[in-house]
Structures are given as structure tokens and as C-alpha cells.
């Protein structure tokens, strides 16, 4: 496994651990399933969708990991920040 993918997977599991305070186990399991199938972008997209659709509140540490992940995966971290800013505690 490429070092970049190991870093992404480690960050995703770090994110999962932090989300235990605001996500249900079923929501976490859905994200974990994508990670297990190496669908890292879908895992992050699912986290974003759950936060928005379920009106979840997240802290800055969670947002920072999400931004770091999007940056590592060459996604638009600026757009992510704009989407998530309304959900910060």
C-alpha cells in the first residue's frame, strides 16, 4: 500500500474516532465500510453528507482533519471549509 494511502486511512480512522461523540454507530459503520473497501473519497463524502443531512455539530479539530484529508486527496479543501463552517460548534 502506498504511503499516501496509509496516511489517508490513518487520518480517516482518526476522524472516525473523533466522530464517535456525534455520529450514531450505524453512521460510523457506513463510513467504515467505505474505508475498508479503499473508497476513501466516498468515506469523506459520506461524513460530509451525514453532517449536513442530519444537522450534526462538529468541532474545529474534526473540521481540521477533514480539511487535511481533502488536501491529501487533492480535493477542494476551500469548498469543504465553506460547506462545514455552519456546522462548527
Where on the chain are the PLM-derived regions?
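C-terminal-biased regions
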Residues: 1-89
Amino acid at each position: 500500500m502506498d504511503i499516501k494511502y496509509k496516511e489517508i486511512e490513518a487520518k480517516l480512522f482518526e476522524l472516525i474516532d473523533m466522530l464517535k461523540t456525534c455520529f450514531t454507530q450505524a453512521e460510523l459503520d457506513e463510513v467504515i465500510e467505505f474505508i475498508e473497501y479503499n473508497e476513501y473519497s466516498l468515506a469523506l463524502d459520506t461524513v460530509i453528507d451525514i453532517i449536513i443531512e442530519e444537522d450534526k455539530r462538529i468541532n474545529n479539530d474534526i473540521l481540521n482533519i477533514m480539511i487535511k484529508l481533502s488536501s491529501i486527496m487533492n480535493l477542494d479543501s476551500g469548498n469543504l471549509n465553506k460547506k462545514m463552517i455552519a456546522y462548527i460548534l
